Amino acid sequence: MGKLLSKIFGNKEMRILMLGLDAAGKTTILYKLKLGQSVTTIPTVGFNVETVTYKNVKFNVWDVGGQDKIRPLWRHYYTGTQGLIFVVDCADRDRIDEARTELHRIINDREMRDAIILIFANKQDLPDAMKPHEIQEKLGLTRIRDRNWYVQPSCATSGDGLSEGLIWLTSNHKL
């Protein structure tokens, strides 16, 4: 009944899992979307979950810590995920290969096979930040042909690119 009412009145929900290496900007993105302002963050041990409403879509966003010791726990959050937001620190060239390995580990899990993939190419405001086409190549996205993915340049602290990412999720998910 709830789904029927959602279809009639236009309220849609989407479960989003936001992952990425530690210090990529996941929590900053979550609270910039939720509160519209930058907040002081500390490394996430465990998770944060918030509902972000944008253009009559309720995004239930799960932001899970990215430290290497926590990453094995990520799979416990996969079930029911409709959209993956993978956040990359574009100024961290030393760990882009590590980010690629983790991204492919996530998307190759059978629980995540139906999730659409949004990459926030974050920290675009920093000098020498990798541009979206470079992120696309270094993450091995061009070889992924059977999945719906998109790279959105972003700056979590200013909010640049964040709403565009939500628009992409909304228009590419079968609600």
From Swiss-Prot:
Tissue note:
Expressed in the head (at protein level).
Q: How is its activity regulated?
A: Activation is generally mediated by a guanine exchange factor (GEF), while inactivation through hydrolysis of bound GTP is catalyzed by a GTPase activating protein (GAP). May be activated by Efa6.
Task: Offer a single GO CC term for the protein.
Answer: cytosol
Lipid attachment points (N-myristoyl glycine): 2
- One Pfam family hit: Arf
Q: Would I find RNA-binding among this entry's keywords? A: no
Record-stated family: Belongs to the small GTPase superfamily. Arf family.
Q: What does the UniProt function comment say about this protein?
A: GTP-binding protein involved in protein trafficking; may modulate vesicle budding and uncoating within the Golgi apparatus. Promotes cell movement and remodeling of the actin cytoskeleton during compound eye morphogenesis. Required for normal ethanol-induced tolerance and preference. Probably after Efa6-mediated activation, counteracts ethanol-induced sedation.
Provide the protein name: ADP-ribosylation factor 6
